[in-house]
Amino acid sequence: MPIVDSGSVAPLSAAEKTKIRSAWAPVYSNYETTGVDILVKFFTSTPAAQEFFPKFKGLTTADQLKKSADVRWHAERIINAVNDAVVSMDDTEKMSMKLGDLSGKHAKSFQVDPQYFKVLAAVIADTVAAGDAGFEKLMSMICILLRSAY
């Protein structure tokens, strides 16, 4: 299932939730390293996205990105937001509220181009559970909610 950022997706089944939690647990237990790896992969594969992060200006190599405290801080925030979604899979209202707030910040305060949510979600999905339709469905849910303020 390709990741989408508009429309709607079917609710996650109990089996999909179980599989997502199993795939996510080892990732989140090492969230600092994994988060940085995900963000570095995102920026090296999509350098135009870096323009929305003024603190990352001048960081042009993967090594520079990995060593940046600002990159590490933002990577942690991203991983924690995904973790919040994983934890909230049984409470979609809570997930909608948290990600809706995050959408508003990205749309109004940071003016991030929403096309990059789907690109980053694909990097996360590939890192966590490559090819798993349930995890891709969760990433789609996140992307749709992150676009809600646009």
Swiss-Prot record:
Gene3D superfamilies: Globins. It comes from the Eukaryota. The keyword Zinc-finger does not apply. GO terms for molecular function: heme binding; iron ion binding; oxidoreductase activity; oxygen binding; oxygen carrier activity. Residues 11-150 form the Globin domain. Heme b binds at H74, H106. Disulfide bonds: none annotated. PROSITE patterns: GLOBIN. Keywords: Heme, Iron, Metal-binding, Oxygen transport, Transport. PANTHER family: CYTOGLOBIN, CYTOGLOBIN-1-RELATED. Monomer. This is one of the minor globin component of Sea lamprey. Belongs to the globin family. This is Globin-3. It comes from Petromyzon marinus (Sea lamprey).
